[in-house]
Amino acid sequence: MINKNDIVADVVTDYPKAADIFRSVGIDFCCGGQVSIEAAALEKKNVDLNELLQRLNDVEQTNTPGSLNPKFLNVSSLIQYIQSAYHEPLREEFKNLTPYVTKLSKVHGPNHPYLVELKETYDTFKNGMLEHMQKEDDVDFPKLIKYEQGEVVDDINTVIDDLVSDHIATGELLVKMSELTSSYEPPIEACGTWRLVYQRLKALEVLTHEHVHLENHVLFKKVS
């Protein structure tokens, strides 16, 4: 049974669908997930702890036996899972979404300057993530696999620390985009492109939070 003293990130690791519940009340399970459920709820002030625990325990009870939980994968298999479930889809979405973000800024930016800032923030986020994922695939993940196989990797702790630092910076950019878009709520006058961009940026945020959680709280723990 999930209780108020359980750590937010650990609950999501054990029951991945709990991420949806934490997200719905604005609780960070990603870079800020190393706090108790009680502490996270108190920080939000408007979250009823008992109701939150009830919802989380409902998820625990309906957890499907036999469904894939990445925490049970070994390091090399988990890395393959991360690459196929997150790295490849993110690269594809960046390629497809960027023209719409650019169009939104160009067409509506003159009258809504925050859309220009949104594009600039998105570009920083996109370029940082692309560079980060490529470095993981080419340099960092092979080191983690070598470590799992018993080889000596002298800088393994530095590798992990640097990746976590990158994730924190990524989280800050996501927060900024959410603030610029009023949590991705388009104004009444928003056109179809505007609504499309907000919808897909919100989905991108969800995917990135899941991605970072899996690396910070599952993958890195297996090699630290």
Curated annotation (Swiss-Prot):
Keywords: Cytoplasm, Iron, Metal-binding, Stress response. GO terms for biological process: protein repair; response to nitrosative stress; response to oxidative stress. It comes from the Bacteria. Homodimer. Di-iron-containing protein involved in the repair of iron-sulfur clusters damaged by oxidative and nitrosative stress conditions. GO terms for molecular function: iron ion binding. One of its GO terms (cellular component) is cytoplasm. It is found in: Cytoplasm. Induction: In stationary-phase. Induced by hydrogen peroxide. This is Iron-sulfur cluster repair protein ScdA. Disruption phenotype: Mutant shows increased sensitivity to oxidative stress. Belongs to the RIC family. ScdA subfamily.
